[in-house]
Amino acid sequence: MKKLIVLLGLAVALSSCEVKSNLYNWGNKSNSKNATEYESSVYNYYHSQSPESLCALLCEYEYMVTHPGGERGVVPPGICAEYGYLLLSPDTPQIFSEHATKRQKERFNSGDYSATFREKGISMLQKEIELYPESAVFIQPLIKKFSQQ
């Protein structure tokens, strides 16, 4: 009887550990180790700070914003804010125009990256507030700062 109770308790404990839900889409699966393109792009950008890694990260953010998935069907928290901030960084348009691949440039479909990135950056910050109103305290000052420039 004791063995049955122990086995039953163990079965309940182990069955409650599995989590199957994905509230958000964190990018495409890129390899057999279950890393995503997003994870790889963020890692590469923050470790190398190269122009190519910035272009790859911008394209991954663009994909995540245009293809939200998961159970909620919305962009994960912070993605729009970080994407918008990167788009509004002063060097981003020039870096993108000089270092992005043809395929990456086609995603943005524009020759004037300065105007496009500025408009899109501000709209991404606004979208972050729309999706996650609690972020307004942090995002509103950024919108104000970049709108005045």
Predicted segments — roles?
Residues M1-V19:
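Sec-dependent bacterial lipoprotein signal peptides
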Residues K2-K3, P133-V137:
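Short glycine/proline-enriched turn or capping motifs at secondary-structure junctions
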Residues C17-Y83, L87-F108, S114-T116, L131, ...:
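N-terminal alpha-helical interaction modules that lie
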Residues I79, F138-I139:
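The tetratricopeptide repeat
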Residues H99, S123-Q126, P141-I143:
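"Short basic amphipathic alpha-helical interaction patches in structured regions
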Residues D112-S135:
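TPR/TPR-like (Sel1-like) alpha-helical repeat modules
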Residues I139-Q149:
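Short, Lys/Arg-rich amphipathic alpha-helical interaction segments
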